[in-house]
């Protein structure tokens, strides 16, 4: 797989602005998707091997050798006493260091390890106050054995000889320490870019800054002393070490990489090793090996942009990230990059791009607040014609997708969905033959507010919101843009709410789960996936019927989309390519993978049945741990 990206080059002195630069590309020729190392927390790289620690309590340190297609993994024991806790590791000048918390946090021991040997204690740092020591977010030891611990924007340096503490304040979050011929340096994640600071004793000097959005800054160890490989979010950047000039950049998703913890690059043979945090609950360490190609290698595929409303720390959900990587590795005509619109400023920029015709080809519609507005303004493509000719057409649960149709058109695809329903207390449920608004009113008359309703706790607004769910069309004429809230039916709803308000329960917010089960006449239930649905039989201790929100004609169930919901920008010149990606979300590899990792029911009937048949009973908590029986 070849890849090419257009890069940005800082110009001028000090702060570096961005202009276009040359390209670089990598080809992957080894991938170990699931190593034996589960839930890695930190990886550091040396010249011959890397070391990894996990989130597992008292787990060993794992040593991973470079240089072959099946990296050898060895286990290194660091623990000398049961009460110890491994906090962090660091590598410098041929030594691996470990920071270990002891004595309930009142002592930190710094230990070092020589290849083939054992850990030996180098220094103990004692707490100066009763509350114990802050372990910090970054730990490092330089060639002279001075210890550095960062917390927030402050670095504390412990002198190798005297142990004297020196506090150093930086203009951002320290992420990586480096040692060069110029002394100790620190890469800092700032609000508007990446800064490099020189540290000499108490003195700090800013060497350069790159003005570029930064997230989860890491480095890839580089045998070339004149350049730095930096990782920020999904970007891999090559930077001039002395000036901060951005020489080249590529997108990790194009390389089939993601969530990089560390890496090692050897200039001599242009080999790059990347260590990545895997997806899913186990999150096994993924190890990839790449070869850098010569400059000028061109990406001949067409670029598609996936616009997401992610967060500042994460662009997209794990399932979409995996789908994009698979698409980039397999598709011969298109590749996808991600553009994140994570705050109000970015959202306004997206709306401006809609108006100018420059919006992303594919749009994340997980948070569909603007869905109707986007459709009305002509920003989204009707996907129904694409679905009608899809091989998956007859396997789709259409009544779920049809929830989102507007004027006969369907402008989003929800590969996964969740369901909101309600349960009626068994004391009253036996009398129900049909379920609609009249049945609901009859229940209320019998109950006389003895039990709460829909967890409204006596608040009229909550009850009105629930009773209007699924009934908007009874009161709002969207075609003629009129509303009728003075009807007899609406007045009846208001009277119910007024009566409900008088039953306000001050203690309801303190109810336990058992109290809720006993005191709720109608309990709202959200089923996020097959597991929550099948295990839900334990709610009342036996099976029970599920109902939708009552309407005059019957009932409606609530449906919500999951983080892989998306649509196609109407102005995209690459709609066919965008559809190829969206249709790939209906493939079994995505449908089942998503369900195994994230919440959601598959939108394909056949796969929903398979997932249901394959689901295993689990132990879950409702007051106390209970295991489902086969009968349940």
Residue spans of the language-model regions?
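Conserved N-terminal structural module of periplasmic/extracytoplasmic solute-binding proteins
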Residues: 14-69, 89, 102, 175-183, ...
């Amino acid at each position: 797989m070849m890849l090419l990206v257009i890069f940005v080059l800082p110009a001028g002195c000090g702060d570096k602005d961005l202009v276009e630069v040359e390209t670089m590309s990598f080809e992957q020729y080894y991938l170990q998707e699931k190593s034996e190392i589960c839930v890695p927390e930190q990886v550091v790289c040396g010249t011959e091997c890397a070391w990894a620690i996990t989130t597992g309590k008292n787990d060993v340190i794992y040593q991973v050798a470079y240089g072959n297609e099946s990296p050898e993994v060895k286990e290194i024991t660091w623990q000398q006493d049961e009460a110890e806790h491994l906090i962090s590791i660091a590598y410098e000048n041929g030594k691996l260091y470990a920071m270990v918390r002891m004595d309930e946090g009142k002592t930190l021991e710094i230990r070092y390890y020589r290849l083939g040997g054992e850990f030996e204690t180098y220094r103990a740092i004692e707490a100066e106050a009763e509350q114990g020591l802050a372990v910090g977010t970054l730990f490092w030891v330089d060639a002279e054995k001075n210890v550095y611990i960062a917390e927030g924007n402050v670095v504390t340096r412990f002198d190798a000889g005297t142990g004297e503490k020196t506090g150093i304040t930086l203009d951002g979050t320290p992420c990586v320490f480096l040692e060069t011929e110029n002394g100790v340096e620190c890469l800092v994640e700032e609000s508007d870019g990446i800064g490099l600071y020189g540290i000499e004793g108490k003195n700090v000097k800013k060497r350069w800054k790159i003005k570029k959005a930064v997230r989860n800054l890491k480095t890839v160890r580089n045998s070339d002393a004149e350049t730095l490989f930096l990782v920020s979010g999904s970007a891999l950047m090559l930077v001039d070490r002395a000036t901060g000039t951005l020489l080249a950049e590529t997108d990790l998703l194009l390389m089939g990489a993601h969530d990089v913890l560390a890496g090692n690059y050897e200039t001599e043979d242009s080999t790059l090793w990347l260590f990545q945090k895997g997806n899913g609950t186990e999150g096994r360490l993924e190890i990839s090996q790449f070869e850098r190609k010569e400059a000028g290698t061109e990406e001949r595929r067409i670029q598609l942009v996936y616009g997401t409303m992610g967060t500042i720390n994460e662009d997209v959900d794990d399932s979409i990230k995996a789908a994009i990587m698979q698409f980039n590795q397999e598709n011969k005509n298109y590749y996808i990059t991600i553009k994140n619109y994570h705050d109000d400023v970015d959202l306004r920029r997206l709306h401006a791009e809609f108006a100018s015709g420059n919006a992303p080809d594919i749009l994340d519609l997980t948070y569909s607040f603007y869905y109707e507005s986007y459709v009305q303004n002509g920003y989204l493509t009707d996907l129904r014609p694409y679905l009608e000719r899809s091989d998956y057409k007859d396997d789709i649960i259409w009544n779920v997708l049809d929830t989102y149709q507007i004027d006969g058109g369907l402008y989003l695809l929800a590969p996964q969905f969740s369901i909101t329903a309600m349960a009626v207390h068994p004391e009253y449920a036996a009398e129900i033959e049909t379920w609609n608004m009249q049945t609901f009113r009859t229940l209320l008359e019998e109950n006389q507010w003895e039990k709460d309703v829909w967890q409204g706790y006596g608040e009229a607004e909550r009850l009105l919101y629930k009773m209007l769910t699924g009934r908007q069309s009874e009161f709002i004429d969207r075609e003629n843009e009129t509303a009728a809230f003075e009807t007899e039916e609406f007045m009846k709803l208001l009277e119910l709410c007024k009566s409900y308000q008088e039953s306000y329960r001050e203690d309801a917010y303190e109810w336990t789960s058992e109290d809720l089960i006993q005191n709720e006449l109608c309990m709202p239930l959200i089923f996020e996936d097959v597991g929550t649905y099948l295990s839900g039989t334990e709610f009342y201790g036996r099976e029970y019927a599920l109902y939708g929100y009552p309407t005059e004609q019957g009932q409606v169930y609530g449906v919500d989309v999951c983080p892989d919901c998306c649509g196609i920008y109407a102005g995209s010149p690459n709609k066919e390519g965008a559809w190829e990606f969206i249709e790939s979300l209906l493939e079994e590899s995505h449908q089942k993978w998503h369900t195994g990792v994230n919440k959601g029911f598959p939108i394909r009937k056949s796969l929903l049945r398979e997932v249901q048949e394959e689901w295993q009973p689990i132990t879950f908590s409702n007051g106390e741990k209970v295991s489902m029986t086969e009968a349940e």
